[in-house]
């Protein structure tokens, strides 16, 4: 049997692995155009939304590693707004910029519009979310980093 190309995640602080992966997705979205052939650049939306999901999940992994629990059940995948609220219940500092814009990106992510052709009323230009995504990555990093 061949060894895996990539070793399994065995870091003593797995939340850092989740956050590093979030940054990879965010970095790939940088510089991509918002519109391609007259259509929204759906891969850019996917990269941004997935970066957000992984960054939020880094907070959840951090809490789980520390033995913390939030009230209620963890929200399902792809509902970025609910995941963010859950992470805030675990101590992540709420950010008004993120709250204002996350609902729109969450809707696109939750309905898989960026992955599969579907009709969705109004779609915001992906670069409108850049500042909120960067703020979220900064906030989650501040929350999980080892001091």
Q: What is the predicted function of each stretch?
A:
Residues 27-43:
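Helix-loop segments that flank and shape redox-cofactor active sites
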Residues 41-61:
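Short, hydrophobic, well-ordered secondary-structure elements
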Residues 20-21, 58:
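Short N-terminal helix-initiation segments at or just after the protein's N-terminus
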Residues 1-20, 26, 64-147:
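Long, charged low-complexity segments
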